[in-house]
A protein has these predicted regions:
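Structured alpha/beta or helical-core interaction and ligand-binding surfaces enriched in interleaved
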Residues: 1-176
Length: 176
């Protein structure tokens, strides 16, 4: 099953975010099922020095990925490990902080988390206000998608950012 999270809820006219403990749980789930993650980093962007020891070289065609937003950004890959989790949770506190908007944030952009076979497990497109889980059988993301503005969408193709059309998705039932 695939899932999508939107930054806005049309039913309640509210902005939606994944932050605090919900954000840390999302990262824990991504780290559980992923081996590598990638981000777009522009020169002098925050975290580039802290993440450098965990950077890996990857053949460009080994992983599915989205194109950059600008010519100055480069795709960097990092191995998943506890030290990286702590770097990410110490510096970034919300899913929408994965952006370099020139104002509040100077962070790496568009994180993708990849399984050991190179397929995408999770991606965040902060510029367009959407996050995606591409789950397989046995991958439990219920601790994340049971909270917030998540929708199921079995028709999400891997690594293609769909036009968010509400009729393609159905609201998930929230657990109390």
């Amino acid at each position: 099953m695939n899932y999508i999270f939107f930054d806005y809820n049309d039913d309640t006219n509210e902005d939606c975010d994944i932050q605090g403990e919900d954000y840390r749980e999302l990262l824990r789930v991504c780290f559980r099922y992923s081996e590598v993650f990638s981000v777009w980093i522009s020169p002098f962007m925050a975290l580039s020095d802290q993440l450098k020891p965990y950077e890996i070289t990857v053949a460009r065609n080994c992983y599915e990925y989205a194109p950059p937003y600008d010519d100055s950004a480069f795709l960097h890959f990092y191995r998943i490990c506890p030290e990286v989790y702590w770097i990410l949770t110490d510096h970034i506190h919300s899913i929408w902080e994965w952006i370099d908007n020139g104002h509040n944030f100077n962070n790496p952009e568009t994180p993708h988390f990849y399984r050991s076979d190179g397929t995408c497990f999770f991606m965040c497109d902060a510029h367009n206000g959407a996050c995606y889980f591409y789950t397989r059988e046995g991958e439990d993301v219920s601790s994340v998608v049971s909270r917030g503005n998540w929708y199921s969408g079995s028709d999400l193709p891997p690594q293609v950012i769909p036009s968010p059309r509400p009729d393609n998705y159905r609201p998930l039932e929230k657990k109390n």
